[in-house]
Amino acid sequence: MSTRRPIQLLDPLTINQIAAGEVIENSVSVVKELIENSLDAGADEIEIETLGGGQGAIIIRDNGCGFRAEDIPIALQRHATSKIREFSDIFSLNSFGFRGEALPSIASISKMEIQSSIEGDEGVRTVIHGGDIVSCEPCARQLGTTVIVNSLFYNVPVRRGFQKSMQSDRLGIRKLIENRILSTANIGWSWISEGHHEIQIAKQQGFQERVAYVMGDHFMQDALTIDKEANGVRIVGVLGSPSFHRPTRQGQKIFINDRPIESLFISKKVGDAYALLLPLHRYPVFVLKLYLPSSWCDFNVHPQKIEARILKEELVGDCIKEAIVETLACPPGILCRTHQEIEESDSVPLPMFRMLETSDVQEEESVEFDQNLFAYSSEDVSLEKQEYTSRGPKSQMDWIYSSDVRFLTSLGRVVLAEDLEGVHIIFTAAARKHLFFLSLMQENSRMYQSQALLIPLRLQVTPEEAFFFSHHGRTLCDLGIEISQVGPCVFSIESTPTVIGEEELKEWLLLLAARGSTDINSEALTALMKETLTQATFSKHQHVFDVSWLKLLWSVGKPEKGFDGARIRRLILDSDFMEG
């Protein structure tokens, strides 16, 4: 029989450590909360320095208004804040923080040092270990605050055991800072990672220059600016050209009142505006900043404030769609400046960056079996054979015999083949996708050939994708996809399996990188390959179907359906030619 335990109040340290579990997930969360404090302090120069992806050390320096010596002990108490006085103030916020939880939460699970000074006063240095103030003494310091966080999660080892890799945290910090670069104006940003300058933005750089820095030249070339206001909603941003799209929503940047926000609702509204301009299952790339009345927004939804409730959601959604449709209909002359044009101005020079323009995806395959498909005269077949001969190597022109299967002819999206069972129709796109999937399975990889490319493919990617490819490059090489890094966000593909086209390979690799992570193990990577390959679109208009692929298909049991359930092969029956 269990004994009754008395109800008691938790001590302040335990309360703060529990709160830290909601607010502070990792080093990225620490950087986020501290730079938001800097922004709320009115800083226009913010420097972030990290070691070990922030797991070793985090240092945030700013030139904000600073702390008075007597304010620091109060600020380290939970729910101490200068942002609000009562609950109703939450709905008229002009600050990023308001709960008064971040600083005490971080202090309770780390060894922290705060150096701060207000204008015209001596600085103060305060050392805190596990939420307890160890020392507080005067120090020489200019206006502003420096917060140093060491030994994160040192007193909660269970939390430390769940941390991701340092590389993953570096990636998260980069994404966080890039979002802040886009969301803020007249604020300089600097990030030093492992002793190297990773990001440097001057406060005088304007919005378009910041977009060019984060999103890259390729995005800016044909991008359109938007700045419209209606019904209390202001929409500002840069819209990618309809020809610039991606297989996932990665690359979509959304801000509400200068807060980075994740909103599927807004993303879908933007997608609706592009709907008639994009191939199926492709997503636009954009930077969109919404400015709404404070009373319309509730940011007190998610512990990390990455979501928002919008009071007049449908009105806002309609405004977004209408504004973007109108902008996309603008004459081509109203375009953003390219990076080259920006460099030729007197602005601070920007580094070359990234992003990939993928080719248009062909329409979905929907070939219905029809007896008209076989209504070819001998002359038609002869002409088809001549056309096939003119565009393929000699070894692929003649009728090919093997002990199992004989190639008959190619009819655009399908191939006809014959074996002892009869004549088969082969749906080439589904067949190639299935063979490519089998080639990725390591136990089958020796059956499939890779081809070295005469001119290597260039793949321009985001930093997130670059981390993935640099981490899993060896695995991809083992599977016949030789990929190497030739720039910060540029990769070169030197060889590929023969059954996949160049643009198909690019699309699939981007899908894989978007869904994967640097920490994924080999078993999970295999499952992810299958999942993303199912989503990828293989061209239905491949001009030459290599007959060696047909022999491969028979060698694996001439399956009727692929790994994804798509129809690969069908035996033509006599009943197909009989009148109903």
Swiss-Prot record:
Domain of life: Bacteria
GO molecular function, one term: ATP binding
Entry annotated with the keyword Protease: no
Annotated GO biological process: mismatch repair
Record keywords: DNA damage, DNA repair
Disulfide-linked positions: none
UniProt KW Ion transport keyword: no
Alphabetical list of CDD domains matching this protein: HATPase_MutL-MLH-PMS-like (cd16926), MutL_Trans (cd00782)
GO cellular component: mismatch repair complex
Role, per record: This protein is involved in the repair of mismatches in DNA. It is required for dam-dependent methyl-directed DNA mismatch repair. May act as a 'molecular matchmaker', a protein that promotes the formation of a stable complex between two or more DNA-binding proteins in an ATP-dependent manner without itself being part of a final effector complex.
Sequence similarity: Belongs to the DNA mismatch repair MutL/HexB family.
PANTHER family (alphabetical): DNA MISMATCH REPAIR PROTEIN MLH, PMS, MUTL, DNA MISMATCH REPAIR PROTEIN MLH1
Name of the protein in its database record: DNA mismatch repair protein MutL
Source species: Chlamydia pneumoniae (Chlamydophila pneumoniae)
Taxonomic lineage from the root: Bacteria, Pseudomonadati, Chlamydiota, Chlamydiia, Chlamydiales
